């Protein structure tokens, strides 16, 4: 039984350590300051660095020239377009504030101290994105706003060269972060025209830092016919360039709650690529060659997602794009938990209450395991006098002692792992809940009650962590403990203190879950113990 308790302690401490190191990497101010310093140390061009066509071997040189900017605005998204090349050089997410209680929208794509842009264009035989430069598109006005009652807005930008009219059109939809970016090539000449589309995302190259166990992730990702979802970090890009031929697929740049992704024509054969150059990481796709006969035209489609990790809408945008909400190895548990969380929130209209609701549902489902755990521990406690008698009788004869103990367990129908196994089974569920709360953009700046105005941030007054520690201390006092080893006793005594310290800086949503879970467990234990005592099993601590 002592070994079971030791295993339980080590397991809980391991889970706590992993979660704490993950939080440090995600939110530690010192690390964030280091990242900001790294970003501000580099200023790179948002134009140029166009990929080579499939029949070329060179990369287009950087071009620092910039045209004028055009603003496109829907109800949830504001894009800033550079008319030189038609690149998206800024995206403001109007439904997400940069800071709590701020009226400034969150800026995802941006230029300046940090380069983070979405580029697209046409290369190839008659491509207009070449060594000589990028096309200077013409547009009717500088600002376009989606009107009331209008569900969609199309903004065409035109460029004409050698008798060929190129039109790049951005289509914004109400309530959506999915932007259609289409090229129409109208060949008004007597010769055949060949172009090849591309889309790429460029980001200032960041160095890895923080935890070795569960590092946070800001970097590239892609999907292909062979691989539904795979991360490709900045460090991976520095080591080797991606070069994958695939039908369909997409490329993306991820950060905590947000993602930018290019989704090419899903019926075409595309090439996924990456590279690093002058402190800039690039991940993109290149589509197949499109041939336009004389006096005809062709349209090449693509989609740009630049917004929050909205699983439902991303799933509708492209296959596997919702996998950018990365739940780690516990995804098969986390996905239904998130579905349950959103369902409850739709009823109670408060994410904090939804977390409490999810906790109640999970603890109710796990109640049979909890009951089995405490029943087994109570039975083990009843056997302690007999086990102690065996120790005195057999002394250092460990083999005989082990044989007699197994015989005793068999006679009494007690599983020595019965008290520990249910907890080990529940640990993956807790880890899945952790990732669910950490990855849910819905919890960002979501209020609970009173002083808790952001469930994704720490409790500013540390009230929830202290309550959690108190509930854990009470739970420990109620739990049967046959531990006699002084070291183990000290570890168990200080566990509530250690957990409280860990949770001081955890997101309040996660602390709320743990506090609620402890309170429910206290009630369940009281019911279980009362029932066990009626059966003559003295389970309470004396």
Swiss-Prot record:
A GO CC term attached to the entry: plasma membrane
Record keyword Chaperone present: yes
The keyword S-adenosyl-L-methionine belongs to this UniProt entry's keyword annotation: no
Transmembrane segments: 7-27, 338-358, 417-437, 455-475, 494-514
Localization per record: Cell inner membrane
Membrane topology: Multi-pass membrane protein
Gene3D superfamilies reported for this sequence: 2.70.98.90
GO MF terms held by the record: membrane insertase activity
Keywords in alphabetical order: Cell inner membrane, Cell membrane, Chaperone, Membrane, Protein transport, Transmembrane, Transmembrane helix, Transport
CDD domains named in the record: 5TM_YidC_Alb3, EcYidC-like_peri
Single biological process term from Gene Ontology: protein insertion into membrane
Recorded superkingdom: Bacteria
InterPro entries referenced in this protein's UniProt entry, alphabetically: Membr_insert_YidC, Membr_insert_YidC_N, YidC/ALB3/OXA1/COX18, YidC/Oxa/ALB_C, YidC_ALB_C, YidC_periplasmic_sf
HAMAP family to which the protein is assigned, alphabetical: YidC_type1
Assembly: Interacts with the Sec translocase complex via SecD. Specifically interacts with transmembrane segments of nascent integral membrane proteins during membrane integration.
Entry similarity comment: Belongs to the OXA1/ALB3/YidC family. Type 1 subfamily.
Free-text function comment from the UniProt entry: Required for the insertion and/or proper folding and/or complex formation of integral membrane proteins into the membrane. Involved in integration of membrane proteins that insert both dependently and independently of the Sec translocase complex, as well as at least some lipoproteins. Aids folding of multispanning membrane proteins.
Protein name as catalogued: Membrane protein insertase YidC
Organism: Actinobacillus pleuropneumoniae serotype 7 (strain AP76)
